Amino acid sequence: MIDYSNEVFTAIGNAVRAEHANVAIVGENIRQPSSFPCVAMDETYNVPSQLSSSDAEEYAAVTYRVQVFATGEGKRAQAREIFATVAKTCHGLNLIRKTYTTTPDLYNSSIYQISATFEADIRSDGMIFRR
């Protein structure tokens, strides 16, 4: 299995921490964080997209889910600012955003959440290609 999720998550986490103070970073899918603001990341899809003649994986198609949680006064603006950093970092890594959703108003939640997915192909040496 071609797995560069730690490298991707580290790059995103470092960028978020550099631009936003006191953001919790979590490397798994969560329903609700224990502290706010929070960025949660997980790999939801990783399958071979090309094999070599010896059946070794050459490329993997991957999808990463990123969730941004904020609460309190200005929660929407805060979540969007943090997400902008995530999106800019992912774009720099050649990860393309495929989905973007926010917490539906029907929940009348005190927590604002942005959830997005980013996709790419990763070569066995870690090079990331847009697809």
Which ranges hold each PLM region?
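Small/polar-rich, solvent-exposed N-terminal microdomains that initiate assembly or binding
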Residues: 1-52, 74-75, 81-82
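Residue-level recognition of well-ordered beta-strand positions that form the cores
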Residues: 42, 65-69, 117-121
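Secondary-structure transition/hinge residues
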Residues: 20, 74, 94, 126-128
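Compositionally biased, intrinsically disordered low-complexity segments
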Residues: 19, 85, 89, 114-117
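Short, charged interaction patches at domain edges and termini
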Residues: 1-11, 32, 46-61, 96-131
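Mid-chain, well-packed structural core segment of small domains
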Residues: 65-91
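Short secondary-structure junctions
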Residues: 22-27, 94-102
